[in-house]
From Swiss-Prot:
GO biological process: terpenoid biosynthetic process
Membrane-crossing residue ranges in chain numbering: 16-36, 51-71, 78-95, 114-134, 141-161, 169-189, 207-227
Broad enzyme group: lyase
Source organism: Colletotrichum higginsianum (strain IMI 349063) (Crucifer anthracnose fungus)
Enzyme Commission number, as recorded: 4.2.3.-
Pathway recorded for this protein: Secondary metabolite biosynthesis; terpenoid biosynthesis
Protein name, UniProt field: Terpene cyclase dpchB
Lineage, top ranks: Eukaryota, Fungi, Dikarya, Ascomycota, Pezizomycotina
Length: 242
């Protein structure tokens, strides 16, 4: 969603808006591939690929901005509504397979469905409140940044805590990482050619977000490589993957 009315954009931005739209389309392709890959990987490995709370936060964001505060352009509507439909599949496989990962915590294992419902409701309320506070155009941007950081932290922690690579793959990591990374050049174009409407993209908060995102998601690839190597060198660790 554009944070400002595109009809008010300066001529300089309109000349390069196709580049920003291309970045948005590539983002949609990357995340679509990631969602499809997560569904397939979850069914194959009988687990969930995305950490639970980030998954609920992401699903709540899709609900909020695909239905309640729908995007304005046809491209954005298609990208995010298709993302919501695929995310339903991701949620289904997570709910189905999550109990297997929580045998060590019976209280959590017995109440996983309730946890999913409460988490989605809680995150959805946060997204809606933020949209009402600052407007849906700016709210979707800031809440998406929060979702991304939670996803990056959650994915890294899940990989390290599990100690195995079941539910993870280089394809899932790269499609997620690249699907989000490609929005950085989009934001640079918006800030460069339409600065008055995108001042926040030059703020310390935004620069911090991009930096932390690069560090966390870049670290995930390295950690996955290390875990895979550890599984190959230690038969006991390799059995945990099965």
């Amino acid at each position: 969603m554009n944070v400002a009315d595109i009809s008010q954009a300066p001529e300089a931005y309109r000349d390069v808006v196709w580049i920003a739209d291309t970045c948005k389309l590539i983002m949609g392709i990357g995340w679509t591939a990631n969602y499809v890959g997560m569904i397939r990987k979850s069914l194959k490995d009988q687990t969930y690929a995305m950490a639970l709370l980030p998954l609920c936060c992401n699903f709540a964001w899709e609900l909020t901005y695909a239905i309640m505060y729908a995007f304005t352009t046809s491209l954005e509507k298609y990208v995010h509504f298709s993302g919501l439909l695929l995310n339903c599949g991701v949620m289904y496989t997570a709910v189905k397979n999550a109990p297997r990962e929580w045998e060590h915590a019976p209280l959590v294992q017995r109440n996983l469905r309730l946890i999913f419902v409460l988490a989605v409701a809680g995150f959805a309320s946060a997204h809606v409140v933020l949209a009402k506070q600052v407007g849906p155009e700016l709210g979707q941007a800031w809440s998406a940044y929060a979702c991304q950081l939670l996803l990056s932290v959650g994915g890294l922690c899940q990989l390290l805590c599990r100690g195995h690579s079941r539910g993870a793959s280089y394809f899932l990591w790269f499609s997620r990482f690249f699907g989000s990374l490609v929005l950085v050049p989009q934001d640079i174009i918006r800030y460069t050619y339409w600065k008055e409407a995108h001042e926040f993209m030059g703020s310390p908060m935004y620069i911090w977000f991009v930096t932390i995102f690069l560090i966390l998601d870049g670290s995930y690839g390295l950690c996955l490589w290390y875990v895979r190597r550890f599984e190959q060198q230690n038969p006991a660790a390799g059995k945990l993957k099965k």
